[in-house]
Design a protein with these regions (language model features):
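Domain-level signature for proteins that mediate thiol-based redox and metal-cofactor handling
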Residues: 257-351
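N-terminal catalytic or cofactor-binding beta/alpha core of small enzyme domains
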Residues: 1-144, 149-256
């Protein structure tokens, strides 16, 4: 048994930092806050996949107990708002889900959308970020494992997989985990099946890809974990394939100097994070792209260090941001304006 901390939007299990393991469950619950009633739906709809991932919460808690990891889980149905979607994703709040009209979502205004984001979406992601920050802040490289489940059939077609391993750009956990699971006799394991792991703005994109943290999404077929016996079986199976990554230092930066390919990957991570950062900034919509390398340069330097999984000196991180030594960048791009330039500026800003 594990102790579960509960607040309005999140269930949280405080694990052991030395495990490095952070378990996530985006679609853990099928409940709604009382103020929303049933969103106009029949009770039976909340027992279906459109409301939550059947069995995923139980597997998450089982793994937290078995491996000593942290766990962050949602407390409300994805029908209210989907935590595994970016804020600009049209499926963030579904008016129609698998052929079912959701009356309570059909005509919500921007104010209600912002309310749901603030109360039920943002706190979940904040708790994930806090958990990861606590680890990286003391030099621990986290491992993120996100637990989901999928239906045995879709649109009348059976799905042959017992489980699927989903991933986007980071295969540090996914590739070897697929091999480990496929080594078990009779087990059919999908590689980015039944879904693709590439979803811009989803939970793992936000907390894994953009931060350079090793991560993987595990989908288990719902009928296999609908009962306790199945949950127990899959907890043991997944624990066996997760444990090696907890012990082998996955996500740690090698001691050797980074080669150009690694630097490029880190730079790409930092700039993807910059894009997400700029989307949140209403004051930089018309930013001059010629000044992009100089804008938020301290943030970029910090993100580069974080993405590397090891300490980078501030000067080295800045050099990677600017493409040259900081002093050289200042000499080229932060020169004092001449008297003529200042006069022209004053003239152009007179009303």
């Amino acid at each position: 048994m594990v102790k579960i901390e509960v607040d309005e939007a999140v269930e949280f299990v405080a694990g052991l930092p030395e495990t490095r393991l952070v378990l996530l469950c985006d679609h853990a619950a099928n409940r709604l806050p009382p103020a929303y009633g049933a969103l106009g739906l029949a009770a039976k709809e909340f027992e279906r996949h459109i409301a939550y991932d059947i069995g995923a919460r139980e597997v998450t808690l089982g793994l937290a107990a078995r491996l000593g990891g942290f766990a962050v889980m949602t407390r409300h149905s994805r029908l209210l708002i989907d935590p595994n979607r970016g804020l600009d994703d049209p499926t963030l709040i579904m008016a129609l889900s698998d052929g079912v009209i959701v009356p309570g979502n059909a005509a919500i205004d921007e104010a209600e959308k912002r309310n749901r984001i603030a109360r039920y979406h943002a706190p979940y992601h904040a708790r994930i970020a806090e958990t990861l920050d606590a680890m990286t802040g003391v030099g621990t490289a986290p491992l993120i494992v996100s637990l989901h489940s999928f239906t045995p059939s879709w649109k009348g077609k059976s799905r042959p997989w017992h489980a699927g391993i989903l991933w986007d750009q980071d295969g540090r956990i996914a590739r070897p985990m697929i091999e480990l699971l496929r080594a078990e006799p009779g087990l059919v394991v999908g590689d980015n099946e039944p879904y693709s792991g590439a979803l811009d703005g989803d939970t793992l994109s936000r907390h894994g890809t953009l931060r350079g943290i090793a991560h993987v999404l595990v989908e288990v077929r719902q009928d296999l974990i609908a009962r306790k016996s199945g949950v127990d079986e899959w907890v043991e199976r997944l624990a066996r394939v997760i444990e090696p990554f907890m012990k082998d230092g996955t996500n740690a930066q090698p001691e050797a100097a980074m080669d150009d390919a690694i630097k490029t990957a880190i730079e790409a991570t930092a700039f993807r994070r910059l894009i997400a950062h700029l989307r949140q900034r209403s004051d930089v919509q018309n930013i001059d792209l010629m000044n992009l390398a100089g804008f938020c340069r301290n943030c970029l330097a910090n993100w580069l260090a974080e993405a590397a999984g090891a300490e980078l000196s501030r000067d080295e991180a800045r050099r990677m941001v600017y493409g040259m030594a900081y002093e050289e960048w200042k000499a080229k791009h932060q020169t004092e304006a001449s008297a003529t330039q200042k006069a022209a500026f004053e003239k152009s800003h007179k009303h």
